[in-house]
Amino acid sequence: MRTEPDRKSSYGRSMTQTQQAQKILVTGATGTVGRQVVAELLARGHTVRALTRDPATADFPAGVEVVRGDLTDPDSLVPALVGVTGVHLITFGGAYFAPLETGPRILELARAAGVRRVTVLHGGEATPLEQAVRADGRVDWTVIMPVEFMGNALEWADGIVTAGEVREPFVSRLSAMVHEGDIGAVAAVALTEEGHGSQEYVITGPELLTVGDKVATIAAARGRDIALVELTEEEAVAQWRAAGHPEDVIGFLLEAYGNTPEVGRTVADTVEKVTGRPARTFGQWAAEHADTFRAG
C-alpha cells in the first residue's frame, strides 16, 4: 500500500542530530539514480560502498569504496555486504537489464550479513527481488517509485543544438517529472533513518508540465528559442525506429505518452516530507544543464 511519510518524524534533520555515520552498499551505482544515491549519502556524511561489474571503468567521487559484484550472481555480493547496515537495490541486471530472478537469494545474503534496511528502485513491475523484499519481515524495506525523470529531456539535446527544435508526439500530455537528485535524497534518508520501513514512496516533482512547458523552460535556460514540432503517432514511430529503438520499447513509449498513468501526472509531496526541503523544479534542472542545450 502506498503511504505518506509521517509528518511527526525527524525527516530532513542533519545526520549529526539523529544518528551516527553508517556504511551503505549501493547497487546500480553507475546508473542515473544510483549515482545520485551515492552523492546524497556522501553529502550526509555516510560511508558508501559502490557495487559495479567493472571497477576499473567506474568513476566515483573520492572516498567511495568500489567493489566488484554482479546481481545476476548473488554469491559475488558476499564480500560487498560485509559490514554494511543498508543496501540500495535495483531490480534489473545483466547486460540486457532483465528482471532479476535472483532476488530471494540476494535478500537471504543481505539478512545473513546483518543488513537492517533496504531500498528498492521500482522498475515498473513487481520483479522477484521486489516481491521477496516486500514479503520479508526481517529487514526494513522501502520501495522507491519515481515517475518520469527530468533527465529524459536530455534526449532532445541533439535536435535542439543542431536544428533548434523538439519533435514529439502527444505534446499536451502532462508529467510530474522528478529531479534524479531528489530520488537519491529520498533513498538516502530511508536507508539511514528510522520510520521508513514497509513503505512505498511515489516520488514526483512539484509541478505538472506539458511538453511545451518543458521546451519553453529549456529555451529560457539556454537563452534561445526552441521550436516544438508535434508528430503524429506514425511519424513518432518512424522517428523512434530510425533511432534504433526496439519494437517493445516503441510500444511502451506510445502507451506511456498517449495514455500517461494517473500516478505520472499527479504531484506528490513525498520529497519535502521525507527530506525536509521542497522538490526541485524543472527550471532548476534546466539551469543545471543549460550548456548541454547550447551549440558549441
Named regions from a protein language model:
Residues R2, S10, T16-A62, T72-V84, ...:
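Oxidoreductase cofactor-interface core, primarily capturing Rossmann-like NAD(P)-dependent enzymes
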